[in-house]
Amino acid sequence: EMGDYYFRFHTQGQTLFYNDGAAWSNSTTYAIGDIAKHNNVNYYARTINSNQQPPNATHWYPLPTNPNIYEIYSPYSEAELFDVNYVQSADVLTTVHPNHAPNELRRYGATKWIIQSIDFGSPLAAPTGVSVSMYIPSSTSTSTDTYVDHEYVVTAVKDNLVDESNQSSSASVSNNIFVTGAKNTITWNAVSGASRYRVYKAQGGIFGFLGETTTTTLVDDNIAPDFAKTPPIHENDFVGTGNYPGAVSYFEQRRVFAGTNNAPQNIWMTKSGTESNMSFGIPIRDDDRIEFRVAAREANTIRHIVPLTNLLMLTGSAEWRVTSVNSDAITPTSISVKPQSYVGANNAQPVIVNNSLVYAAARGG
């Protein structure tokens, strides 16, 4: 249930209630979602905090009493509720509104719900302390005039092998690694949460993939970099007033957003197999995030995104079908958009019945 700046929860025809929290203590560090009692009022922790005495609206949300109805803070006012769009995936509800950054409402227990803005950046920090040392056999008669600069960057990778950090600061060294036995050794500091590291080498103004390791050292003994794979570039287009999406859904293992005030006919898809990874490389790869604009005669905000056999986008004046130019999955280079009809939809959330879409037509009311 969504109301004026609150969420309430119901299951099997019953409203959820909470138990009184322990007395608030200035020596306790509270996690988001914790309940503490102060001056006979129970408070829901909106942030991770300590020594922040309730009532403090930045950190605490007062809960109803008599009865103890469980509710949490919502960023949406009563006037905004009919324009909130949402999609559910298991215990995660994604909510969007053009006035607010995209949010996730997550269920951790019957009375443990948390709403937070979505972080579209990398979950890993970029490696630090990157350095490179050179070695060339002392018996080599090669002149230092033949030495060239070799520049490297490193990224951290999670155990899913998909989430990758931004590239580190670069480190370089001069050497002639074409000589037998010559090598460059790249080292860096470990990153919390990383299971592997990828090293990239510069050539022609771009960094190409050199190698991958589970340690914090890699040796380059004249390895040819692969420029089909480059360090990821993370972008978050949903920052600032006018840049928040008003529509959301899922399609082909991507979370899909659309319809900001500043780009009403743009659509964004996360990196394949991820929920919030908006990274891409140069050159573009098939699993990179997708961003495109629907070119149409009339500029109408995308109000709804509906996944069927094809992805459907509903605006106030038309319906659009998003497909691939071939029979494969949608990729950044294969995406195709065609008009389906010219009816238009209003703001009411569409409903899928079997394999059909039911939506309320836009009638100007």
How does the language model describe each region?
Residues 1-18, 258-287, 322-331:
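Beta-propeller domains
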Residues 2, 40, 95-97, 106, ...:
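Glycine-rich, histidine-containing beta strand-loop boundary motifs that form or position
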Residues 4-46, 58-252, 286:
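Disordered, low-complexity "stalk" and linker segments at domain junctions of extracellular
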Residues 49-56:
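Basic/aromatic-rich interaction segments and small domains that mediate binding to polyanionic partners
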Residues 52, 102, 163, 206-208, ...:
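Flexible, glycine-rich phosphate/dinucleotide-binding loops
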Residues 68-73, 224, 275-297:
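Surface-exposed loop and turn segments in beta-propeller and other repeat-based domains
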Residues 83-86, 248, 254, 262, ...:
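Beta-sheet-dominated scaffold domains
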Residues 96-97, 101-128, 255-257, 269, ...:
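Beta-propeller fold recognition
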